[in-house]
């Protein structure tokens, strides 16, 4: 039986000392969105629950204001 290496959970926001995630910081928000426009879950990114809530709220506000698109796959 092959055991897969499991990556250690790592919260980038805790490590960098970021207190609040800003909806105007597009470069950070784009790292947590898939190419389909979905928000990447915290079990994949390793983000703590407190920051995942702030992140999803910031992404939704940025989408509403038109800073980031709802989806990148317009055909």
From Swiss-Prot:
One Pfam family in the UniProt entry: Ribosomal_S18
GO terms (BP aspect): translation
GO CC term, one of those recorded: cytosolic small ribosomal subunit
Protein function: Binds as a heterodimer with protein bS6 to the central domain of the 16S rRNA, where it helps stabilize the platform of the 30S subunit.
Chain coiled-coil ranges: none
Keywords: Ribonucleoprotein, Ribosomal protein, RNA-binding, rRNA-binding
GO MF terms, alphabetically ordered: small ribosomal subunit rRNA binding; structural constituent of ribosome
Superkingdom of origin organism: Bacteria
Protein name listed in UniProt: Small ribosomal subunit protein bS18
Gene3D superfamilies given in the database record: Ribosomal protein S18
Record text on subunit structure and interactions: Part of the 30S ribosomal subunit. Forms a tight heterodimer with protein bS6.
Sequence similarity: Belongs to the bacterial ribosomal protein bS18 family.
PROSITE patterns cross-referenced by the UniProt entry: RIBOSOMAL_S18
């Amino acid at each position: 039986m092959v055991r897969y290496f499991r990556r250690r959970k790592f919260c980038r926001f805790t490590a960098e000392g970021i207190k609040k995630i800003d909806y105007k910081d597009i470069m950070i928000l784009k790292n947590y969105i898939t190419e389909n426009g979905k928000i990447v879950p915290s079990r994949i990114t390793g983000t703590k629950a407190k920051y995942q809530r702030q992140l999803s709220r910031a992404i939704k506000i940025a989408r509403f204001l038109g800073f980031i698109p709802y989806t990148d796959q317009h055909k």
